[in-house]
């Protein structure tokens, strides 16, 4: 379990434990229908302050192998669905908040290294998560993902929050 590869459910649990929380877990029911389909690339775009980050945290907590969230989701609306646990904690998840990465790059006055920093961090997490496989810093992220998939058959869910920060800023 890493910070970005197979993250835990802490961010989602913080959202879930807020005084005001709206259960939007049924979106996962809809997403589950898209897994292994031609429509498996999804973009959740809504106005600001609409809960996209919370949805990303929830989606990560549901799919990530880095946590066990059966008890949490069984008590939510999704838990009422017959196959709510079909994909529960079954995928390698990469979850990135590009705004956080961007802000750190700005603080260091190194926007030019933003993608390099993300890449190096993820390759380091791949090395820890999959010690039986060898990864080198020259490999691209897609090469790392394909290596894991070809060697283990394990699939990935990739969640990118604040994906528009590079265009917006």
Residue ranges and their predicted role:
Residues 1-169:
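Phosphate-binding site recognition
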């Amino acid at each position: 379990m890493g910070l970005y590869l197979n993250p835990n459910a802490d961010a989602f649990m913080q959202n879930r434990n807020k005084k005001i929380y709206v259960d939007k877990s049924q979106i996962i029911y809809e997403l589950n229908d898209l897994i292994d389909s031609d429509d498996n690339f999804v973009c959740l775009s809504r106005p600001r302050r609409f809960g996209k980050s919370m949805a990303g945290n929830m989606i990560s907590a549901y799919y990530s192998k880095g946590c066990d969230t059966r008890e949490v989701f069984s008590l939510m609306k999704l838990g009422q669905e017959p196959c709510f646990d079909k994909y529960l904690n079954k995928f390698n998840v990469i979850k990135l908040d590009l705004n956080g990465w961007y802000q750190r790059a700005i603080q260091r006055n190194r926007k030019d290294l933003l993608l390099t920093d993300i890449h190096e961090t993820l390759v380091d997490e791949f090395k820890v998560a999959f010690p039986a496989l060898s990864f080198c810093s020259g490999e691209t992220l897609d090469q790392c993902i394909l290596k894991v998939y070809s060697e283990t058959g394990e699939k990935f869910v990739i969640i990118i929050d604040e994906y528009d920060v590079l265009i917006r800023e």
